[in-house]
């Protein structure tokens, strides 16, 4: 057997040659010189197709190529057929083939297949979630970037509404609301709410608009309270249990509307009598009041001021008897609400009326005695006949006589105005109200039917600009809407101008059950203060107010409100059953946005005792009967929301306040795990998180009752994560011995001194126990392994470069470091499915540097 001779020189085969080759091999392993890949397979394929399309076709086809191949002894046609017969699709080996050939390959194939399927599913889910996130973000951004002109006008209106005293006014209303809520929490139903708000409005009634707002509060108070300041709606606060706004078939409750009509009319009558007294006091010489200042003398004095000039009555059509315009006298008695005085006047002067209207005393007496102000049928027929024959068609008749007959007999309801004597807005509305009636009978003829709904339609037909001088005095139209019982429209109209009063009107109406409310909107506006309308039409055509949106918007726009005051404005939602869940949701959002946990949710002292908060003390007002229910509905829900939003520090505190201590520790572990993951990139650890974790664990450890509520595995995981933090901090400070000591206490890595015989067994045992670790610790194992390996490498390099690197102790240490490094590499490859490839590459490089 002959061997080929080697022509290389002899010295090349010596020790220097082998040393040079080994060094070169080590350098290539540590820093492999791989070529730089400029294009991936997809780009290469795309470029190949592009170049193929750019190659010009040969004029003679493939003739030259055929001749060239034939000259080399190749049959081009046969070769082309063989190429076409080849299958270029590589069929993956089937499970059956793998099972008969190689079990290890079979397992590896299935593992890779599962990993790829999982990754593909994860990528698809991530893409779907990202697309949804982009769509939601675009919707919110688009809405903000395209504000409508209505929103701009609405914002300008709100800006105009802040007159002097607006801040003090809103603060005073807020403190009054809080006081009423506290009294209700202690004593139950609060009947003084409307009177308390009315007093605040009186205190700030300094100009025309604020005075009219005060008048509106007095009007609402007259509807709600009786003469003894006791609410007429019982002690439930919900009108569906006392007066139904709408019955099940949608018909309007006549009893409720009649009360609104009567109260509004009486309010206007009392208001007019005050104006009358002021006019008399202002012009006493023209009034010529003589004798006792009785009601009749005051009415006569007002007639002198209004209808008498230089001793002559200005209207020649007035019927004057004994120097008294009797029809004007009776009309203004009715206008001031003195019906009994008018009846007494006609009875005392019956002989005078025999000359002008013989039967009128009977008419007005029957009108006063009728329960609903409707004359008996016989008298009504006589009055209609007299009205049609002597009053309605006569051009020179007394206008006050026309008005009085129209009021008492409800004549000619197709014309409900009397412009010659009711030229002022309040007089016009009063005239409409005194003509309106609410009937329960279905047999009422059409010409006799004129109700509060008809008055409402008349008012709405004019619109707001007609009564407010093109928007310069919006409170006037609000006042008229309140007079007609259109509370929902009134509040919606007032809110852009005077939000504080509008919100408190809404709270009061809802509290006493006067408000028709829409179903819960379930979506909170992203742009507070820019709500165009809060009215929703019901099936019966009546508007309903989105009460929840109103309160939420006010709490978001009013900057003067503290978190507790904001909660006071959300609590009234619970007066309406359908808003209870929205109230709880809004309170949770308030807690997270303000982060005023101590005042809103309370605190837990070091001894485990609770310090109650505002919401806990007022839990009965938000439909929560017990502390346990309160913690579940409010505190725990807020904690879950904070957890979902990634506010982990807030979630920890909220779970702690909700007395779900195990969940608090779970979030702590998650936060620690996330911080450890970021540590490898930033080498910075949040000190506040560490101090919070240690302080809370110290509280739990010192209180057996709290300690028992935390799961053992959670406590163990927290301790292991804190040890990991210590190891990472030690590594940052280049204290590698301490880093390895802390990691050794984890008992995750094979860092303990081992005999070579049991080394493999221990490593495999730790690798099997790996999957039982908590996920927050599990995800940090690659970082833990890398920190341990780098610490060993640094210690190895330090020991090797020391001046005592050749003694026996140093040699033993170096050998121990290499053994630990080898075990770590072995351990890492046993759990390689959880180890990134770059980590494995770094581990191999470290091991090579240590050998």
Curated annotation (Swiss-Prot):
Keyword Nucleotide-binding tagged: no
Pfam families xref list: Nic96 (PF04097)
Cellular compartment(s): Nucleus envelope
Keyword Methyltransferase: no
GO CC, alphabetical: cytosol; nuclear envelope; nuclear pore
GO biological process: meiotic cell cycle; poly(A)+ mRNA export from nucleus; protein import into nucleus
Superkingdom of the organism of origin: Eukaryota
Single GO MF descriptor: structural constituent of nuclear pore
InterPro entries linked: Nucleoporin_int_Nup93/Nic96
Chief subcellular location: nucleus
Keywords: Meiosis, Nucleus
Family to which the UniProt record says this protein belongs: Belongs to the nucleoporin interacting component (NIC) family.
General function of this protein: Has a role in meiosis.
Name of the protein described by the UniProt record: Meiotically up-regulated gene 87 protein
Lineage: Eukaryota, Fungi, Dikarya, Ascomycota, Taphrinomycotina
Name of the coding gene: mug87
């Amino acid at each position: 057997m002959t061997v080929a001779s080697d022509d290389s020189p002899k010295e090349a085969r010596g020790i220097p040659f082998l040393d040079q080759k080994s060094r070169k091999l080590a350098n290539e392993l540590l820093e492999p010189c791989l070529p730089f890949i400029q294009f991936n397979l997809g780009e290469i394929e795309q470029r190949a197709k592009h170049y193929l399309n750019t190659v010009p076709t040969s004029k003679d086809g493939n003739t030259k190529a055929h001749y060239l191949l034939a000259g080399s002894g190749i049959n081009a046609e046969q070769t082309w057929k063989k190429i076409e017969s080849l299958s270029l699709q590589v069929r993956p080996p089937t499970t059956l083939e793998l099972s008969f050939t190689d079990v290890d390959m079979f397992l590896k194939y299935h593992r890779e297949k599962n990993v790829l399927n999982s990754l593909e599913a994860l990528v698809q889910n991530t893409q779907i979630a990202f697309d949804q996130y982009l769509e939601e973000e675009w919707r919110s951004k688009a809405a903000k970037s395209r504000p409508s002109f209505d929103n701009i006008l609405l914002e300008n209106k709100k800006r105009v509404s802040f007159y002097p005293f607006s801040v003090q006014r809103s603060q005073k209303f807020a403190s009054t609301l809080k006081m009423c809520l506290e009294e209700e929490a202690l004593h139950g139903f609060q009947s003084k709410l409307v009177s308390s708000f009315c007093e605040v409005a009186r205190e700030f009634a300094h100009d025309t608009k604020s005075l009219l707002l005060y008048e509106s509060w007095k009007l609402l108070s007259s509807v709600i309270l009786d003469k003894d300041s006791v609410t007429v709606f019982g002690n439930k606060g919900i009108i569906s249990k006392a007066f139904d706004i709408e019955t099940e078939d949608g018909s309007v409750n006549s009893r409720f509307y009649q009360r609104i009509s009567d109260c509004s009319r009486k309010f206007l009558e009392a208001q007019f009598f005050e104006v009358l007294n002021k006019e008399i006091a202002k012009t006493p010489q023209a009034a010529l009041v003589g004798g006792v200042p009785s009601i009749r003398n005051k009415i006569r004095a007002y007639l002198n001021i209004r209808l008498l000039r230089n001793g002559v009555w200005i209207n020649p059509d007035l019927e004057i008897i004994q120097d008294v315009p009797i029809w004007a006298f009776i009309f203004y008695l009715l206008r001031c609400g003195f019906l009994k005085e008018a009846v007494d006047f006609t009875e005392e002067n019956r002989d005078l009326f025999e000359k002008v209207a013989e039967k009128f005393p009977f008419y007005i007496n029957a009108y006063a005695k009728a329960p609903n102000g409707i004359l008996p049928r016989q008298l009504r027929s006589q009055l209609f006949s007299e009205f049609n024959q002597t009053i309605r068609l006569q051009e020179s008749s007394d206008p006050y006589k026309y008005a009085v007959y129209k009021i008492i007999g409800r004549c000619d309801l197709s014309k409900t105005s009397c412009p010659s004597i009711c030229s002022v807005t309040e007089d016009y509305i009063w005239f409409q109200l005194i003509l309106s009636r609410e009937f329960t009978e279905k047999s009422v003829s059409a010409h006799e039917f004129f109700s509060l709904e008809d008055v409402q339609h008349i008012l709405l037909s004019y619109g707001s600009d007609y009564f407010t001088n093109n928007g310069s005095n919006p409170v006037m139209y609000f006042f008229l809407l309140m007079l007609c019982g259109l509370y929902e429209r009134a509040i919606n109209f007032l809110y852009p101008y005077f939000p504080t009063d509008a919100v408190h009107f809404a709270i009061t109406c809802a509290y006493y059950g006067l408000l028709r409310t829409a179903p819960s909107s379930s979506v909170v506006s992203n742009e507070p203060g820019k709500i165009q309308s809060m009215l929703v039409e019901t099936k019966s055509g009546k508007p309903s107010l989105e009460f929840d949106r109103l309160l939420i918007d006010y709490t978001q726009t009013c900057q003067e409100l503290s978190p507790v005051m904001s909660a006071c404005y959300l609590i009234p939602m619970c007066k309406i059953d359908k808003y209870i869940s929205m109230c709880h949701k809004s309170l949770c959002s308030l807690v997270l946005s303000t982060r005023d946990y101590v005042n809103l949710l309370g605190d837990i002292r070091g001894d485990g005792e609770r310090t109650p908060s505002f919401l806990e003390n007022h839990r009965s007002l938000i439909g929560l009967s017990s502390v346990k229910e309160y913690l579940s509905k409010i505190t725990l829900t807020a904690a879950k929301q904070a957890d979902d939003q990634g506010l982990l520090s807030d979630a920890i505190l909220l779970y702690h306040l909700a007395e779900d201590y195990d969940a608090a520790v779970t979030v702590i572990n998650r936060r620690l795990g996330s911080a450890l993951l970021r540590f490898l990139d930033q080498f910075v650890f949040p000190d506040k998180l560490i101090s919070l974790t240690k302080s809370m664990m110290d509280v739990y450890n010192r209180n057996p009752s709290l300690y028992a509520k935390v799961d053992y595995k959670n406590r163990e995981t927290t301790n292991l994560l804190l040890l990991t933090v210590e190891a990472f901090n030690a590594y940052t400070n280049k204290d590698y011995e301490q880093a390895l000591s802390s990691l050794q206490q984890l008992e995750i890595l094979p860092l303990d001194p081992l005999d070579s015989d049991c080394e493999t067994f221990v490593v495999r045992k730790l690798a099997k126990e790996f999957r039982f670790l908590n996920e927050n610790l599990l995800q940090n194992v690659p970082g833990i392994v890398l920190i341990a390996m780098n610490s060993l490498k640094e210690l190895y390099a330090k020991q090797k470069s020391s001046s005592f690197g050749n003694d026996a102790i140093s040699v033993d240490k170096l050998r121990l470091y290499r053994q630990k490094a080898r075990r770590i590499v072995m351990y890492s490859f046993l759990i390689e499915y959880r180890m990134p490839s770059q980590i494995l590459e770094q581990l191999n490089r470290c091991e090579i540097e240590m050998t």
